[in-house]
Amino acid sequence: MALILGVESTAHTFGIGVVRNGKILANARSTYTTEKGGIIPMDAARHHEQRKYGIYEEALKEAGIKESEVDAIAFSQGPGLAPCLLIGMKFTKEIAEKLKIPIVPVNHCIAHLEIGRITGAKDPVMLYASGANTQIIAYAAGKFRIFGETLDVGVGNFIDNFAIHAGIGFT
């Protein structure tokens, strides 16, 4: 009955989930928002830095566990915004060293596909459109494969730039 923490910090959200044998026990998170414009990576990273310990305590409380019960900690290693990813990685290393537990790096895109597989989707295909990344990804022949990707402006960057020019905030 492995008890796993998962740390998400790829962009606007800092979150910590707690899972035991496929059952979600907690999903605590805080989202960086702006009133005007898109995500400012350093501001999002500051948001994560300021909230990480509170989110951690909230996740443990929501799951009804003590940190000493945690068997391993996973974290999103990318893709994502480098300053935000760094906060999540450092936090993960800190907790893992404190608890003397293993770290499991996770690819954010693959995690989305795995959720599809875990929930019973047969051969899930994903259009991943986030920031500079726009890819068509699927599981085929025993591997995750990229079947296509943009060679110029990513859909996420296009949407961010449009929102900035239109004066739309990020919420």
Predicted regions mapped to residue ranges:
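Short acidic/glycine-rich loops and adjacent helix/strand connectors
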Residues: 1-171
